[in-house]
Structures are given as structure tokens and as C-alpha cells.
């Protein structure tokens, strides 16, 4: 995987400016800046202000993180503080490991 060729589109659904929402956003931004700097788009959706968006996307709990692109769509509900859990849940860690394995094998 060449990260430079992919753009990751993510949506974070939160319920207002609660401590859980603030923590989820801060943690997610840290992960994205460390791992995907410059190649991601993050839209934060407050389900209290935009309940129709939550309904359209079938969001039942917050915080919910949804990876829209690249396919397939993946969702993580709840605590986002575990970096590895977030990356695995969104199929992003698997892509990193696959690329590292491929590069290691091709350099032999």
C-alpha cells in the first residue's frame, strides 16, 4: 500500500461537547496526524445538532467513528483511546502490516 495514493475519509459522530466527545476527537486527531498526516479528511458530526445525519448513517451510539473511504466502510463504537484497536477496527493496521511485509519480501 502506498499511503500517498490513498485518501482516508472518516466521520466521527459525537453527542455534543461532552468529555467523551472531546476525548474521542483529541485521541483520533493524534492517531491520524501520526499515521496519516495530510492524507485524511475528518468530518465531525454532532448528532444532537444533526440527528438526520445520524439516522441516515444508522448511528445508534456515540462516539462512533466511521471510515468511508477506502472501502469497505468500517465503524468503531465507543472508546477510541486504544490506537491499535482503532487501526485494526478500521482495517488500517492490517494495510500497514501488509505493506511492510511486502516491502521486506521484495528487498530480499
Curated annotation (Swiss-Prot):
Matching entries from InterPro entries are given as: Circ_KaiB, KaiB-like, KaiB_domain, Thioredoxin-like_sf
Q: Could you tell me the superkingdom of the organism this chain comes from?
A: Bacteria
Q: Which UniProt keywords apply?
A: Biological rhythms
Q: Which residues form a coiled coil?
A: none
Function as written in the Swiss-Prot or TrEMBL entry: Key component of the KaiABC oscillator complex, which constitutes the main circadian regulator in cyanobacteria. Complex composition changes during the circadian cycle to control KaiC phosphorylation. KaiA stimulates KaiC autophosphorylation, while KaiB sequesters KaiA, leading to KaiC autodephosphorylation. Phospho-Ser-431 KaiC accumulation triggers binding of KaiB to form the KaiB(6):KaiC(6) complex, leading to changes in output regulators CikA and SasA. KaiB switches to a thioredoxin-like fold (KaiB(fs)) when bound to KaiC. A metamorphic protein which reversibly switches between an inactive tetrameric fold and a rare, thioredoxin-like monomeric fold (KaiB(fs)). KaiB(fs) binds phospho-KaiC, KaiA and CikA. KaiA and CikA compete for binding to KaiB(fs), and KaiB(fs) and SasA compete for binding to KaiC, thus the clock oscillator and output signal pathway are tightly coupled.
* Oligomeric and partner information: The KaiABC complex composition changes during the circadian cycle to control KaiC phosphorylation. Complexes KaiC(6), KaiA(2-4):KaiC(6), KaiB(6):KaiC(6) and KaiC(6):KaiB(6):KaiA(12) are among the most important forms, many form cooperatively. Undergoes a major conformational rearrangment; in the free state forms homotetramers as a dimer of dimers. When bound to the CI domain of KaiC switches to a monomeric thioredoxin-fold (KaiB(fs)). KaiB(fs) binds CikA, leading it to dephosphorylate phospho-RpaA.
**Notes concerning its domains:** Has 2 forms, fold switches to a thioredoxin-like fold (KaiB(fs)) when bound to KaiC.
Protein name, entry field: Circadian clock oscillator protein KaiB
Q: Please name the source species.
A: Trichormus variabilis (strain ATCC 29413 / PCC 7937) (Anabaena variabilis)
Amino acid at each position: 500500500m502506498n499511503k500517498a495514493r490513498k485518501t482516508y475519509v472518516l466521520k466521527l459522530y459525537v453527542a455534543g461537547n461532552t468529555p467523551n466527545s472531546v476525548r474521542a476527537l483529541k485521541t483520533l486527531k493524534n492517531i491520524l496526524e501520526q499515521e496519516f498526516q495530510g492524507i485524511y479528511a475528518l468530518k465531525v458530526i454532532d448528532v444532537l445538532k444533526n440527528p438526520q445525519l445520524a439516522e441516515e448513517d444508522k448511528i445508534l451510539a456515540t462516539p462512533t467513528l466511521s471510515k468511508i473511504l477506502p472501502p469497505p466502510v468500517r465503524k468503531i463504537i465507543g472508546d477510541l483511546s486504544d490506537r491499535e484497536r482503532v487501526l485494526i477496527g478500521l482495517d488500517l493496521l492490517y494495510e500497514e502490516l501488509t505493506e511492510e511485509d511486502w516491502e521486506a519480501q521484495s528487498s530480499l
